Design a protein with these regions (language model features):
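Conserved N-terminal catalytic core of the sugar/cofactor nucleotidyltransferase
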Residues: 2-5, 13, 27-105, 109, ...
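Histidine-centered beta-alpha loop that forms part of the nucleotide-sugar donor binding/catalytic region
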Residues: 8, 54, 133-134
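A structural signal for short hydrophobic beta-strand segments in well-ordered beta-sheet cores
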Residues: 25, 144-146, 197, 209, ...
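Glycine-rich phosphate/pyrophosphate-binding beta-alpha loops
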Residues: 85, 216-224, 307-311
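Catalytic-core segments of class I nucleotidyltransferases/pyrophosphorylases
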Residues: 100-102, 109, 115-122, 136-138, ...
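A short, conserved acidic/glycine-rich loop-to-beta-strand motif
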Residues: 124-134
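Oxyanion-binding "anion nests"
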Residues: 233-249
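Phosphate-binding and adjacent anionic-ligand microenvironments
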Residues: 246, 251-344
Length: 344
């Protein structure tokens, strides 16, 4: 089976992390998040891949090239105007041809069992199959309501708690048939969740929802990004970490002062050059904190500075509310603490 990676995202909500790179190139434990997706596809036997690009396409093409170094064959299709998720995939029609194919986001982290998804699709032969994951905070996502046989009857887009009747969310991982793509107009902005899937249901086509075990995270905000990085380092997210080390969840923090508070000290033996992005500073081995740095965003500020006389960092988080400040400080301390154990 072939796969199309949706990799046109700019990542506006993720700024300043995406200040000088497209969202699929945001680093996750030493590799771009899209590289982890390619490795996931390869583990499940998918090596014929096309990336649908729009924002800063040359950055992505220059990094991955033909895909040979990752053991895959990688092609690219570039949108000249915004086409939406389904429209961007339609732009790859010459790639997928007359075969069913898998669609996956290039800027979400996951270790879902794609082989199970493919097997269910082949067994049931729906117009489209959607990977569903349980989400404890489903308000930011589209929910899928399934019948007893697993076929989707309706969707609820970003509901409030009064309308949350399931915690199964649409992961944006699909297996699509060519007959479904016939409903997508060419060179027109068209979305899978908002346009194509409702239209398929209206026409009486079958949409299969497959609940999937494993990890899935939409890296859409700095908070979710930090949480995803921590999950990767702790082993909750099963990915290949750069450098050859394995994640091992600690029983407790190595520094007793490293706890959830607005001001926390956290040990770190990271040494190299000063980075201007929080993603690089925490995730690239050898970042230099000797001068410290400050990250400012909409309603929050994170300051990281060395403590004189010892190999520790002071992490100070300020935000418009205490809860956000706690979350920022906690995530930053967890990442630094995990890095310390691997760099010591």
């Amino acid at each position: 089976m072939k796969a199309i990676i949706m990799a046109g995202g700019e990542g506006r909500r993720l700024k300043p992390i995406t200040g000088d790179m497209p969202k699929p190139l945001v680093p996750l434990c030493g590799r771009p998040v899209m590289e982890h997706i390619i490795l996931l596809l390869r583990r499940h036997g998918i090596t014929d891949i096309c990336a649908a690009l729009k924002y800063r396409p040359d950055d992505i093409k220059n990094y991955f090239g033909s895909g040979e170094k990752l053991g895959v064959r990688l092609e690219y299709r570039i949108e000249q105007t915004a086409l939406g998720t389904a429209g961007g995939v339609k732009n790859c029609a010459d790639f997928y041809g007359s075969e069913d194919f898998l669609v996956i986001s290039g800027d979400a982290a996951c270790d879902i069992d794609l082989s199970k998804l493919i097997a269910e699709h082949k067994r049931r032969s729906p117009a489209a199959t959607i990977a569903l994951c349980p989400e404890p905070e489903p308000l930011r996502y589209g929910l899928a309501l399934c019948d007893r046989e697993g076929f989707i009857r309706s969707f609820i887009e970003k509901p409030d708690w009064r309308h949350v009747v399931t915690n199964l969310v649409n992961t944006g991982i699909y297996i699509i048939s060519p007959r479904a793509m016939e409903l997508v107009p060419k060179n027109t902005e068209f979305d899978f969740a908002k346009d194509l899937f409702p239209r398929l249901l209206d026409k009486g086509e079958k949409l299969l929802g497959v609940p999937c075990d494993g990890y899935w995270c939409d890296i859409g905000t700095p908070k979710s990004y930090y949480e995803c990085c921590a999950d990767a380092l702790s082993g909750k997210l099963n990915i290949e970490l750069a450098g050859g080390f394995e994640a091992d969840a600690p029983d407790e923090c190595s520094d007793p002062e490293c706890e959830c508070m607005e001001h926390a000290d956290c040990g770190c033996t990271d040494r190299a050059r000063l980075m201007d992005r929080i993603s690089s500073a925490f995730l690239e081995l050898g970042a230099d904190y000797s001068d410290g740095f400050r990250l400012k965003g909409d309603g929050y500020e994170l300051r990281i500075s060395p403590l004189s006389g010892c190999k520790k960092l002071r992490i100070a988080a300020n935000a418009k509310d205490t809860e956000t400040a706690h979350e920022l400080a906690e995530a930053a301390c967890l990442l630094a603490g995990e890095l310390e154990k691997r760099l010591d």
